[in-house]
């Protein structure tokens, strides 16, 4: 029986229309005018009022100069408080370093803490820039496809072991995982740590999506697992995804042992210089005062991740989507639809919906698309109705 969704209560986010979102200030919506943007990992829900107020105060106070040590220290305190309160991870605030973004933190992890030119293991599917940025700075990528066990994406531990044995020195560990939305649990983290330790390797832990978890799912920061993981890990995180402030260009690089901290002091100024003052102001406000807004957003996204399952089943029957445990990213296998050529290109041109092409996320991801569902649900439905119509018009398998 079909549910009459017209009688269901709406949310204020649902009132945000395409006309409102389709503005030149938005890369997500302006790069492909007239099409629905579901490709950039940012939300269409605005920003927490506490963050907006902090930014207005900073502007009123003419706080637009270079980042000051007290501001950096305050961000360190706020980040450490968040890590302790949310994950039980005791972080020394002095080991929280402002950087421009998580990619900058990754660059530090491989260029300063790993041998020059050493290969880096990237489990796939992966955040697209991991696969292009690392070779660009002289570190070859070894792609290791994940495996599906009981309907969940997991790391292929045997192949990670083999990649370290073949000469890799660093593993990129994205948790929660982008794009599958899997939260890597303690047992799997411990298994990864055993492999890394046995080979004398290192880990870059990208934990940017950690605040965006559903059903109260626990999250274990990799560096907190043991003394061994703390000794071989650089962590990159940011308020940018959970609080929707990516354009403010601020992230946090966290060192978790004395040796890494001492080394960072030798080059850290140049890296910290890339962090934006307003981004630090906004991030501090997010960690200290932004939880009520985040809680509301997660509740809305929780409904949307399940709504996406309905939309895929109704409009793209045969496509495979598994409801993510975290993030606002959906990973959809469209292989069974028989789309000729790259599916994201098909949906962009035939349905007016802009997604991310699976093949850009690594070998073996052909036939998939990545969809960002952090948009008003009426727009999400409009997108999948259009996608289903495009598949039917093309005479494909629906």
Language-model-detected regions and their locations in the chain:
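N-terminal small-domain helix-loop-helix segment of the aminotransferase-like
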Residues: 2-101, 108, 288-289, 394-397
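Conserved core segment of the aminotransferase class I/II
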Residues: 55, 227-302, 391
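PLP-dependent enzyme catalytic core of the Aspartate aminotransferase-like
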Residues: 81, 346-355, 361-398
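Conserved glycine-rich beta-strand-loop-beta hairpin in the small C-terminal domain of fold type I
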Residues: 284, 301-309, 321-334
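A non-catalytic, amphipathic alpha-helix used as a structural packing/dimerization or gating element
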Residues: 74, 78, 259, 263-266, ...
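Conserved core of the PLP fold type I
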Residues: 64-194, 211-212, 217-228, 234, ...
């Amino acid at each position: 029986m079909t549910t009459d969704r017209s009688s269901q209560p709406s949310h204020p986010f649902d009132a945000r229309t395409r006309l409102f979102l389709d503005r030149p200030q938005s890369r997500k919506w302006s790069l492909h005018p007239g099409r629905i943007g579901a490709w950039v990992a940012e939300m269409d829900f605005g920003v927490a009022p506490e963050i907006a107020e902090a930014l207005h105060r900073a502007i009123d106070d003419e706080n637009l100069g270079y980042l000051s040590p007290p501001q950096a220290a305050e961000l360190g305190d706020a980040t450490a408080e968040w890590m302790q309160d949310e994950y039980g991870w005791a972080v020394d605030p002095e080991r929280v370093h402002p950087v421009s973004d998580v990619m900058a933190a990754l660059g530090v992890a491989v260029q300063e803490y790993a041998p020059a030119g050493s290969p880096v293991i990237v489990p796939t599917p992966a955040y697209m820039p991991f696969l292009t940025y690392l070779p660009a700075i002289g570190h070859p990528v070894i792609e290791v496809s994940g495996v599906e066990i009981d309907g969940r994406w997991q790391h292929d531990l045997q192949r990670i072991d083999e990649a370290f044995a073949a000469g890799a020195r660093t593993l990129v560990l994205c948790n929660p995982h982008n794009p599958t939305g899997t939260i890597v649990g303690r047992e799997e983290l411990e298994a990864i740590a055993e492999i890394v330790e046995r080979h004398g390797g290192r880990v870059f832990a990208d934990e940017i999506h950690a605040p965006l978890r559903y059903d109260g799912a626990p999250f274990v920061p990799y560096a907190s697992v043991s003394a061994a993981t703390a000794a071989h890990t650089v962590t990159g995180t940011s308020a940018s995804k959970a609080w929707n402030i990516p354009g403010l260009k601020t992230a946090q690089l966290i060192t978790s042992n004395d040796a890494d901290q001492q080394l960072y002091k030798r080059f850290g100024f140049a890296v910290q210089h890339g962090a934006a003052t307003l981004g630090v102001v906004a991030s501090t406000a997010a960690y200290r005062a932004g939880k009520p807004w985040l809680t509301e957003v997660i509740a809305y996204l929780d409904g949307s991740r399940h709504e996406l399952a309905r939309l895929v089943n109704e409009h793209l029957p045969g496509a495979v989507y598994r409801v993510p445990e975290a993030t606002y990213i959906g990973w959809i296998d469209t292989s069974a639809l028989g789309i000729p050529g790259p599916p994201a290109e098909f949906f962009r041109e035939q349905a007016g919906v802009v997604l991310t092409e699976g093949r850009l996320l690594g070998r073996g991801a052909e036939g998939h698309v990545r969809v960002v569902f952090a948009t008003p649900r009426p727009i999400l439905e409009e997108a999948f109705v259009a996608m289903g119509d495009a598949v039917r018009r093309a005479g494909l398998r629906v």
